[in-house]
């Protein structure tokens, strides 16, 4: 690998894939030799967006060469990145998450903004560099914003995200509401997923105090369909906890129509889950989290406080 590679986090979501592609497009137009890559399989929601705007998914990688120059988008925490990230040379980070478990040997360009989506930052960066966004890139940037903001309904969604979404929808030539709902529904089709798929397709590991916590989130139209698999979910999650030396695993199923989530908590620290969300996990270790849709803003932040 000679070029600088651009990638997002493991278990990639739509923002991670689309922002990697879009930032590679911008950097290339600015004269840099870069290539987008990915650290996992493309989910149905993301594939829907890529197909809509005639864009191929980036190459899949598992490692980068030692010393390779890399740019991180949509993440910065090393446990969410490529396995040997400590041996890479990180040149840039473009992100919208908390900054944690991150260090470099050399100075770098680090841009983190409190917006709902990395794509919103990239849309600004096109403007700052006087580079026009073409129709297909506008489409995938829009798709990323729709995904991260649950069609502009998430509490992480800012006015900047809203403005960017409307602007990009016009460039892409799509109706924001109808396209957005179609895309989210495509992602919520979990009929062909195994239980292992469900708990890994959008899972992120977090350091909370001295605890290792993994939080997996899936979007669904009918949460009850997912939890018909309760016993198997518990079995597979317990195995994952043991294999990865985790303290706690949260499996969050978000109802994209009602904007609520149901959580299944397995491992140590279930009392902290109760305290964080002012709920009581039932005998099956589940609870309804009313109005909770954002892992970043409504789950990670409040749960981290309980582990301090």
Swiss-Prot record:
Which positions bind Mn(2+) 2? 15, 74, 96, 148
What EC designation does it have? 3.6.1.1
Superkingdom, taxonomy of origin? Bacteria
Does the record bear Zinc in its keywords? no
Q: How is the cofactor bound?
A: Binds 2 manganese ions per subunit.
**Cofactor requirements of the protein:** Mn(2+)
Q: Which residues cross the membrane?
A: none
What does it catalyze?
diphosphate + H2O = 2 phosphate + H(+)
Entry's localization field: Cytoplasm
> Manganese as a keyword?
yes
Mind naming one GO cellular-component term on file for this protein? cytoplasm
Q: Mind telling me which PANTHER family this protein's record contains?
A: BNIP - RELATED, MANGANESE-DEPENDENT INORGANIC PYROPHOSPHATASE-RELATED
Family per similarity comment: Belongs to the PPase class C family.
Task: Return the protein name.
Answer: Probable manganese-dependent inorganic pyrophosphatase
């Amino acid at each position: 690998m000679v070029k600088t590679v651009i990638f997002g986090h493991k278990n990639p979501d739509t923002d991670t894939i689309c922002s990697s592609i879009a930032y590679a497009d911008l950097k290339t137009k600015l004269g840099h030799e870069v290539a987008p890559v990915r650290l996992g399989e493309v989910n149905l929601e993301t594939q829907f967006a890529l197909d809509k705007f005639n864009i191929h998914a980036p190459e899949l990688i598992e490692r980068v060469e030692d010393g390779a120059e890399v740019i991180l988008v949509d993440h910065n925490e090393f446990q969410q990145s490529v396995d040997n990230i400590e041996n890479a040379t990180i040149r840039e980070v473009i992100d919208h998450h908390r900054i944690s478990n991150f260090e470099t040997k050399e100075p770098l360009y680090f841009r983190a903004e409190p917006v709902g989506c990395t794509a919103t930052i990239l849309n600004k960066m096109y403007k700052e560099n006087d580079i026009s966004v073409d129709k297909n890139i506008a489409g995938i940037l829009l798709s990323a914003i729709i995904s991260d903001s649950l069609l502009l309904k998430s509490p992480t969604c800012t006015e900047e995200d809203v403005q960017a979404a409307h602007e990009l929808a016009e460039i892409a030539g799509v109706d924001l509401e109808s396209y957005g709902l179609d895309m989210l529904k495509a992602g919520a089709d979990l009929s062909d997923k195994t239980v292992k798929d469900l708990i890994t397709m959008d899972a992120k590991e977090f350091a909370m105090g001295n605890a290792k916590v993994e939080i997996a989130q899936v979007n669904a139209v009918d949460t009850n369909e997912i939890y018909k698999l309760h016993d198997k979910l518990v079995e597979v999650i317990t195995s994952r906890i043991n294999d990865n030396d985790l303290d706690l695993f949260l499996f969050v199923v978000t109802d994209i129509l009602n904007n609520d989530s149901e959580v299944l908590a397995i491992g140590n620290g279930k009392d902290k889950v109760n305290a964080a969300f002012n709920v009581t996990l039932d005998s099956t270790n589940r609870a309804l989290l009313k109005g909770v849709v954002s892992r970043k803003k409504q789950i990670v932040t409040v749960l981290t406080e309980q582990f301090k």
